[in-house]
């Protein structure tokens, strides 16, 4: 390999963030990008290293990456992530944490470059085949993919691991060896260490042939996207939920294709055929009076008002009270529910000096809200306002003392209504 075949989208970008583990692949990628920067002085190049804390050598890997980046004059960002069991397995969870850190580190106008190569593409295809994936899963990885509002580029995707090794040796590059890469208990390592060498011994061009198949699958998926675009428009609401009535009229095959694309739009993991069947049978077709729920990692699919919802799992906060000692400043909510803030200009009265301020998630008794005659219990108000059941004990309720003032984004009580122009608004950043 004498030159790197950069994705054409990369050629038009002047701001690049390179994922840099310090291993062979990412070292070659960063080296190539440094050479690219030398030829194009307007290019701004940064690197990011993710410290997973999984290896006893993780700290020394950070020092290695710092040394390399200092020598090549590449600013390095080191992000430490904490991995907890989320039911996806350590490989999937580490990958999820990595890409979340990448997304948070990207600057406006910056693209992300990662070092996957042809052998990685082959492994990804075979893993998808093992899972029984269809054309979407077998499409494997693209050279250019949307990511976090920008692009994820894989400039080495047409190069083999052997070619990368030859480049690294020829240019005297130093890289680290992750001991976990030799553990064939991991599926990807098993393919790389055992299966692929045997296949390539028999068929030397096997990875390239697999890559062609992946490309053909990707083309078929793009064609399906075009053909199903009008169906998606009919089925998906402005809130991103999936209307069930059009799906009821579709064939099983067409409906499954719509479900997959809706989940992909919600950044959900690609579901198996069995998972799609469960979504339809256990959630969509559940009894009318049921509140069906199907968990997928830290998310779940629910049905409400003849629509499917993809939501993050949040524990109910029914018994939680959060004291708001200084109501002029934002208040952080528990369970990742975001923050609330009282801002000038609105229909809520300000708290009186003697009134304590708090956020709660339940309210007893009969309530009287602005714009409605008569009193209602909170459950009835939620139903009338079309608030899904899972949001009813996670929607912040503003209290002054023991008096309910408002529900964020839903209603204001008569006791909470402003009587002058000095009112405030309850803003919830979920």
Swiss-Prot record:
It is an enzyme of class 6 (ligase). CDD domains: TilS_N. Coiled coil: none annotated. It catalyses: cytidine(34) in tRNA(Ile2) + L-lysine + ATP = lysidine(34) in tRNA(Ile2) + AMP + diphosphate + H(+). It comes from the Bacteria. GO terms for molecular function: ATP binding; tRNA(Ile)-lysidine synthase activity. Its EC number is 6.3.4.19. InterPro entries: Lysidine-tRNA-synth_C, Rossmann-like_a/b/a_fold, TilS/TtcA_N, tRNA_Ile_lys_synt, tRNA_Ile_lys_synt_N, tRNA_Ile_lys_synt_subst-bd. ATP binds at residues 21-26. Its main location: cytoplasm. It is found in: Cytoplasm. It holds the Pfam family ATP_bind_3. The keyword Nucleotide-binding applies. GO terms for cellular component: cytoplasm. GO terms for biological process: tRNA modification. The keyword Disulfide bond does not apply. Keywords: ATP-binding, Cytoplasm, Ligase, Nucleotide-binding, tRNA processing. Belongs to the tRNA(Ile)-lysidine synthase family. The N-terminal region contains the highly conserved SGGXDS motif, predicted to be a P-loop motif involved in ATP binding. HAMAP family: tRNA_Ile_lys_synt (MF_01161). Ligates lysine onto the cytidine present at position 34 of the AUA codon-specific tRNA(Ile) that contains the anticodon CAU, in an ATP-dependent manner. Cytidine is converted to lysidine, thus changing the amino acid specificity of the tRNA from methionine to isoleucine. This is tRNA(Ile)-lysidine synthase. It comes from Salmonella heidelberg (strain SL476). The lineage of its organism: Bacteria, Pseudomonadati, Pseudomonadota, Gammaproteobacteria, Enterobacterales.
